[in-house]
């Protein structure tokens, strides 16, 4: 249907995939799709609903400022709290999707950079404490 903006959320990598997380002052650009009940049923299977992702109804605005109520998949706890590796293939598909849709890839780059820093910090070895000298 078109490009829209979701206010009050940020794009974030969790458990190797993208999701949206509430964040004051942030926004996420995406596409509004028109889907049939059959399409939604197929998407539910693909997205792992209701175990991996849940569905929420949120309001977005299109380029003309018109509000639209949409359904989005959001990652469930505890999955959204896990930092797992992201595949380069997944990143390439998401980036190409942004470019094909005419969405700025900056939000993807920002989410990727934030994830890499958090993953690296989590994976960093803990320094050993040295025994005091006698």
Where are these regions (language model features)?
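Glycine-aromatic micro-motifs
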Residues: 1-134
């Amino acid at each position: 249907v078109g490009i829209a903006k979701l206010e009050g959320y940020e794009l974030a990598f969790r458990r190797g995939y993208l999701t949206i997380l509430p964040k004051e002052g942030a926004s996420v650009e995406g596409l509004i799709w028109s889907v049939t009940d059959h399409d939604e049923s197929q998407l539910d299977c693909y997205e792992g609903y209701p175990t991996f992702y849940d569905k929420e109804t949120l309001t977005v605005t299109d380029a003309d400022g018109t509000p639209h109520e949409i359904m989005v998949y959001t990652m469930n706890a505890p999955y959204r709290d896990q930092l797992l590796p992201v595949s380069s293939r997944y990143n390439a598909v998401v980036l190409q999707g942004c470019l094909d849709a005419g969405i700025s890839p900056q939000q993807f780059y920002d989410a990727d950079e934030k994830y890499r820093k958090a993953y690296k910090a989590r994976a960093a070895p803990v320094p050993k404490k040295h025994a005091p000298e006698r």
